[in-house]
Every structure is written in structure tokens, then in C-alpha cells.
Amino acid sequence: MAVPKKKTSKAKRDQRRAHWKRKATIEAQKALSLGKSVLTGRSSFVYPSPEDDEE
């Protein structure tokens, strides 16, 4: 016979949500940092720098 599952506590729910948000914040910071380095021209690992094309 079907038995209802136990309800997840608010503390557990909030803990999981906080962990997910923390991971999302870290990834957003990484993306922002990469975007800044691309715009300032400091990222030779994403796009080859113009000096390499002269050869």
C-alpha cells in the first residue's frame, strides 16, 4: 500500500538551496572574471594573441 513520504524539513530545504546558490555565485564570478580578461586583452588562452599571427 502506498505510504506518503516524510516531509523534508525547512532547514534541510534551505541548506540545499543555499548550497545551490553558493555554487551559482561562484560560477557567475568565474564568468565575470573571464569576461573582464577577454575585454582587457589579457586572455591569450581564449583567443590567440595578435603577435602569434605575424609569423
Curated annotation (Swiss-Prot):
Q: Which is one Pfam family of this protein? A: Ribosomal_L32p
Extract the GO molecular function terms from the UniProt entry: structural constituent of ribosome
GO terms of biological process kind = translation
Name the UniProt key words of this record, in alphabetical order: Ribonucleoprotein, Ribosomal protein
Q: Where is this region: Disordered?
A: 1-26
Key word Ribonucleoprotein present: yes
Q: Which InterPro entries match?
A: Ribosomal_bL32 (IPR002677), Ribosomal_bL32_plant/cyanobact (IPR044958), Ribosomal_zn-bd (IPR011332)
GO CC annotations, alphabetized: large ribosomal subunit
Q: Does the keyword Ribonucleoprotein apply?
A: yes
Q: Where is the composition biased (Basic residues)?
A: 1-23
Similarity comment text for this entry: Belongs to the bacterial ribosomal protein bL32 family.
- Kindly give the HAMAP family that the UniProt entry links to this protein: Ribosomal_bL32 (MF_00340)
Listed name of the protein: Large ribosomal subunit protein bL32
